[in-house]
Amino acid sequence: QARQHKRKGRESLDCALALQELERLGVNHIITFDAHDPNVSNAIPNLPFENIYPTNTILEDLLQTEDLEDILVISPDMGAMERARYYAELLDSDVGVFYKRRDLSRVVNGKNPIIEHTYMGSDVKDKDILVVDDMIASGSSMLEVGKMLKEQGARKVYFIATFALFTEGIDGFVKAYENYYFDKLYTTNLSYIPKEY
């Protein structure tokens, strides 16, 4: 789930270096789940690289446990748009996306802070929304998106992510859930989630 897959500024390409080191150590096959950027396999062109997506498993569970009506699939940012499109095609639904406008004049915790989220897509009113991404790191963007969708009249909001890291804990998610900013979060056990969560 490494995100050091493309160079920004003077950052290293840690994911590519790690894969090359595994190859030097004699690893002869790489199996991973939902690589942040599957193109990182280009760093090891002579090794088989299997990238397994849990999309269908998550979707099966969602469809068996939820009473979904008018579905709309939404990407929380431009980076997850391909994933959202895939879900939308499987569900024969529309797709929307949030654009993150950032303040490029400053850096906070290694990133340009988000100034605003702008939704681009069809009306969310009375729809069951699936917000899909590969990972939830801190979750602040996902929570902001959920709040905005509910304020715009979404019937239900479901967060779906392969990796739920909760790098800033779950208090924000608990509060957002209590405020009805989202209805349920679907994830996998591919990242460690403490029992108290």
Predicted regions located by residue number:
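PRPP-associated nucleotide enzymes
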Residues: 1-197
